[in-house]
Amino acid sequence: MQIKPFEDRYRDDLIFMVLEAKDALGRVPHINDDLLEIQKSYFDKGDRFWIAVDENDRVIGCVGYNRIEHTNEAFLHRLYVKASMKHLGIGTALLKEAETAMRQNGIAVARVHLGEPAEQWFESYAFYPKHGYRLYAPRDMLKELKG
């Protein structure tokens, strides 16, 4: 597995992976608008977005973040791992990549919205606390990023 910044040539494979991941969670698959224009939604704003690819250069995971204006905080977005590749450390590796970049860019607090209903997003509610995140609202967690 390799984690690298998103490139447009991976767009369709990324979209397919996200739709598959949502379907595996019992969600009606749809694509969020930001995933259709990652350059505009992330990079053009000074934010970041990564993909994890396997040995065949296929997308198996992703994560991004957007800084919250006029703060030293950012929201994590779109942490997905291909359904057949969960529990192999890919999500943890992607999260660490994002947190490291946030720290390097002066971001002190990472926030994440967990989705609803909680029953469908149960993996998020279990995953983030294992990595130091805590609830600050019914469906939102945060983590203070230490240097």
Set out the residue ranges of the language-model regions.
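Conserved GNAT acetyl-CoA-binding A-motif
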Residues: 95, 102-116
